């Protein structure tokens, strides 16, 4: 299963982008790709990652727009949204 430690480690390089905006770093996009591979095909992994992302998003105010654009800016299609308001039980 996916742990919150793994999710946090993958997205730590994105904190500057998420809190200040601009362009995500190469390390950040690499973390996003890593997160995509972690959440690949198994629903429990996606739901676990979703819950971790919700907790992480709740720790930082004002990251909503930056977080929503992150996968697009990195050119990675995530199966899990980075949002405080996602109902993780509905992710399939």
Swiss-Prot record:
Disulphides: 4-52, 14-28, 29-74, 50-88
One of the record's GO molecular function terms: lipid binding
GO BP, sorted A to Z: lipid transport
Gene3D superfamilies from the UniProt entry: Plant lipid-transfer and hydrophobic proteins
Tissues expressing the protein: Expressed in seeds and, at very low levels, in pulp of fruit (at protein level).
Keywords: Allergen, Disulfide bond, Lipid-binding, Transport
InterPro entries noted in UniProt: Bifun_inhib/LTP/seed_sf, Bifunc_inhib/LTP/seed_store, Plant_nsLTP
CDD domains in the record: nsLTP1
Zinc found in the keyword field: no
Family label: Belongs to the plant LTP family.
Function comment: Plant non-specific lipid-transfer proteins transfer phospholipids as well as galactolipids across membranes. May play a role in wax or cutin deposition in the cell walls of expanding epidermal cells and certain secretory tissues.
The protein's name in its UniProt record: Non-specific lipid-transfer protein 1
Protein species of origin: Actinidia deliciosa (Kiwi)
């Amino acid at each position: 299963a996916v742990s919150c430690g793994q999710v946090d480690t993958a997205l730590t390089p994105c904190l500057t982008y998420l809190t200040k905006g601009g362009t995500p770093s190469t390390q950040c996009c690499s973390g996003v790709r890593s997160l995509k591979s972690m959440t690949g095909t198994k629903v429990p992994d996606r739901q676990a990652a979703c819950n971790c992302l919700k907790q992480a998003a709740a720790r930082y105010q004002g990251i909503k727009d930056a977080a929503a654009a992150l996968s697009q800016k990195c050119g990675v299609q995530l199966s899990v949204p980075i949002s405080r308001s996602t109902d993780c039980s509905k992710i399939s």
